[in-house]
Amino acid sequence: MSALIIQLSRVVGTLREEAGFLWKYAAFMVFIYLLLPKPAYKTNVRVPTIKFMSPWLPGIISRLLFNSKAPSVIYDGYSKYKTSAYKLLKPDGDLVVLSTRYAEELRQLPASTLNALEATFSDHVGEYTTILTDSHLHTETIQKRLTPAIGRLIPRIISELDYAFQVEFPNCDNQFVAINSYEVFLRLVARVGARIFIGDELCREEKWLKASIDYTKNIFLTIALLRPFPGFLHPIVGRILPSSRSLDRQLVYIKEELLGPLINKRRSLEAVSDSNYEKPDDFLQWMMDLAKTEKESHPHNLAQRLLGITSMAVVHTSAMSMTHILYDLLVMPQWVQPLRDEIQTEIADWRSTTQSNLNNLRVMDSFLKESQRFNPPGELSFHRVVKHDLTLSDGLLLPKGTHICMAAGPISMDPEVVENPDVFDAFRFVKEKVPTSGFVSTGPSHMHFGLGRYACPGRFFASIVMKLILSRFLAQYEFHFAPDQTERPRNLLIGDKIVPNVSTPIFIKNRAPEI
């Protein structure tokens, strides 16, 4: 998902813990780069190459600096070649950034021509983060079962949030209490995700929540640690990273001790042919029902696929977005009351909230989209790998194996695309009233969820969950930074990825509930 992103802010602390490891291998990496230059996949697409500082500097410098300087080179390339294409040099390969003028001819091409899963695998160093690319089962399940079911799932989500707000927030009736907003949002989303994805039997078990959240963190930690290294070093570094080794152990535990037994139990009950048995109505069961091959149906494969979709496409990304939204409200408190007024109007009774009520939260929807415009998951989107030589309408040849993308960040901050792009306007998309103005809508001017047939399929579910959490939070709590915190915490940049800095405490206190 799109979508798909890097790192928890808390990774910064973990990176420090593993600093000794990193410095040793950083030195080794530089040595290898300088003396044995074997860069990862290079593309021979005939487009300008954007280098850091000067076009005359060796490409190796741009590769080494990409992780810390990516936004500057991405914006530089966009400013010069936004109507054509340009090339970026990453430590582990090349990216060809295409203009949105190619969007219409590319967006509907099949996976046999432009493969999104393979691009995701590459962008998230999938060989070391347990990403599966052997089928579209999870995407099919989202599109055919999850998204159409959102309306009837809302009461379950609300029920789980009622419980989650009780157990995850501190007692703060009489005074402001500090919380780590990202960690709280992470557990809220993880609880909701577990209720919908694995059902009632396991969703509130702390062993599941801990295992799935730790798994999520280790995925993004592994990505953050591996990205600075050239691709040819990944087999060495990836296999000795503590976070990568932890991932392997956690995956085995979840497969064999948690999800595997649950899947086998369900299949045993189905085999009995008991007329009183009702299949669980959750994502895991939907995948079991839709799996077409023996490989897709294997309990370990189902478990790994479910973990991937929940950790990367639901839990982490939603928690990051919620943290960004809260920070934006803290530094722009003038938007809090309009949001509360809308919530009180549209959600008169919290437990009776419907999908229609949530769709009517137009100001909130616009705020979510504007927050995402300023704090996208990454500067690049629409990642695809070209599966066979492809010639575009203007004659540009994309050889087989080329990794293409589009500059979603610069596009959404371009004054030719967005009026007054440097101004945060919470009502921007309420005023637009066009088909692409909704938070989950995609188009050439707003690509943070991707574009075309493989745009983030889980965005509809994530949007509903985020709106419910934000509605409950704004109705129930007052909140502020510490007195000495006067500015929004700066985002962290990991290559082209953008994550919130969650080292800043937030102080909350109960207020008279309005819903």
Swiss-Prot record:
Which GO BP terms apply? Answer: mycotoxin biosynthetic process
Q: How does it sit in the membrane?
A: Single-pass membrane protein
What terms describe the molecular function in GO for this protein?
heme binding; iron ion binding; monooxygenase activity; oxidoreductase activity, acting on paired donors, with incorporation or reduction of molecular oxygen
The coiled-coil regions, if any, are: none
Cellular component (GO) terms are: membrane
Q: What is its EC number?
A: 1.-.-.-
Positions of transmembrane segments: 20-36
**Entries under InterPro entries matching the protein:** Cyt_P450, Cyt_P450_E_grp-IV, Cyt_P450_sf
What happens without the gene? Abolishes the production of the janthitremanes shearinine A, F or K as well as of 13-desoxypaxilline.
Q: Which UniProt keywords apply?
A: Glycoprotein, Iron, Membrane, Metal-binding, Monooxygenase, Oxidoreductase, Transmembrane, Transmembrane helix
* Positions bearing carbohydrate: 501
Pathway it works in: Secondary metabolite biosynthesis
Per UniProt, the enzyme's principal EC class comes to: oxidoreductase
Metal-binding in keyword set: yes
Where does this protein reside within or beyond the cell? Membrane
Q: Nucleus among the record's keywords?
A: no
Give cofactor(s), names only. heme
Q: Where does heme bind?
A: 456
Task: Explain the purpose of this protein.
Answer: Cytochrome P450 monooxygenase; part of the gene cluster that mediates the biosynthesis of the indole diterpenes janthitremanes such as shearinine K or shearinine A. The geranylgeranyl diphosphate (GGPP) synthase janG catalyzes the first step in janthitremane biosynthesis via conversion of farnesyl pyrophosphate and isopentyl pyrophosphate into geranylgeranyl pyrophosphate (GGPP). Condensation of indole-3-glycerol phosphate with GGPP by the prenyl transferase janC then forms 3-geranylgeranylindole (3-GGI).
Tell me which family the UniProt entry assigns to this protein. Answer: Belongs to the cytochrome P450 family.
Q: Specify the protein name.
A: Cytochrome P450 monooxygenase janP
Q: Which organism is it from?
A: Penicillium janthinellum
Phylogenetic placement of the source organism: Eukaryota, Fungi, Dikarya, Ascomycota, Pezizomycotina
